[in-house]
C-alpha cells in the first residue's frame, strides 16, 4: 500500500509540473505573438494609396513624354483626345463627389472636376484659335 501511495504522490507531482510547464508555454506563446504582430504589420506591404500614387506618377511621366514627342502636325488630334479623356474624368469625378458624407474622395473628386474642366475649356479655346488661323481673312 505504501508503494501505491508513493506512486500516486509521484504522479500528482508530475501532473503539477506538467500543468506549470503548459502554463509557462502558453505565456511564452502569447508573448511571442505580441512580439511578432508589429513585424507582421510592417511587412504586410504597401497600402493601396501608395500603389495608386505610383500609377499616377508614372502616368504623369508617360503623358509628359508622349505629348512632347508628338510632331506639331499631330497636336490638334492629340488635344481632341485629351479633351475626350478629360470628359471621362469629369464623369468619374462627379460619381466620386456624389455621396452625401464628407470624405477625402469628395474633396479629390471636386479638384478632379475643377482641373479637368480647366483642361477641357482651355483645349476648346486653343482649338478655336488654331482653327481661326486657317480661316480666310475678310477684306
UniProtKB/Swiss-Prot annotation:
Keywords: Cell inner membrane, Cell membrane, Membrane, NAD, NADP, Translocase, Transmembrane, Transmembrane helix
Reactions this protein catalyses: NAD(+) + NADPH + H(+)(in) = NADH + NADP(+) + H(+)(out)
Single biological process term from Gene Ontology: NADPH regeneration
EC number, as in UniProt: 7.1.1.1
TM helices/strands, residue ranges: 49-69, 78-98, 107-127
Listed Pfam families: PNTB_4TM
Compartment(s) where it occurs, according to its Swiss-Prot or TrEMBL record: Cell inner membrane
Gene Ontology molecular function terms on file: NADP binding; proton-translocating NAD(P)+ transhydrogenase activity
Principal localisation: membrane
GO cellular component terms given for this protein: plasma membrane
Membrane topology value: Multi-pass membrane protein
Free-text function comment from the UniProt entry: The transhydrogenation between NADH and NADP is coupled to respiration and ATP hydrolysis and functions as a proton pump across the membrane.
Family annotation (PANTHER family): NAD(P) TRANSHYDROGENASE, PROTON-TRANSLOCATING NAD(P)(+) TRANSHYDROGENASE
SUBUNIT field: Complex of an alpha and a beta chain; in Rhodospirillum, the alpha chain seems to be made of two subunits.
Entry protein name: NAD(P) transhydrogenase subunit alpha part 2
Organism: Rhodospirillum rubrum
Record lineage: Bacteria, Pseudomonadati, Pseudomonadota, Alphaproteobacteria, Rhodospirillales
Gene: pntAB
